């Protein structure tokens, strides 16, 4: 019976990550975002990603899923966001990003109990293009 309790605990703990659409390997361009995320911040970060960014991203033309990666030894997170084309990614108005970014930061502030305007500031942002075989 203890295996069932362990399985249920794992399912309940991991459920928010299931809400994230995996990165499509056929994405033509991959947005790369890097930020500091400590062990203590990890769960709040995952929840805010799933509840704030994922619904917004799913509404954007050309969105091809994403992967959330975390390096515990460096306390770093990397978000890879796939886009069908650079043009579709570039066509997203900056004004539409702001409200989602603020909601993401507000959820992080509440969850982490901090007052920082941007609790997990971006350290790097850029794009990569997949190698074609």
Predicted segments with their positions:
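Bacterial N-terminal signal peptides that target proteins for export
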Residues: 1-7
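Generic structural motif
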Residues: 38-40, 86, 125
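Short, surface-exposed ligand-recognition loops at beta-strand->loop->(often short) alpha-helix junctions
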Residues: 36-49
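Short, aromatic-enriched amphipathic alpha-helices that serve as compact interaction elements
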Residues: 32, 49-52
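Glycine-rich beta-strand-turn "strand-cap" elements at beta-sheet edges
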Residues: 4, 15-30, 67-75, 101-133
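An amphipathic, aromatic/His-enriched active-site/gating alpha helix that lines ligand/cofactor pockets
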Residues: 51-64, 82-120, 131
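Short, well-ordered beta-strand segments in beta-rich or mixed alpha/beta enzyme
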Residues: 28-36, 65-96
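Hydrophobic alpha-helical segments of integral membrane proteins
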Residues: 9-13
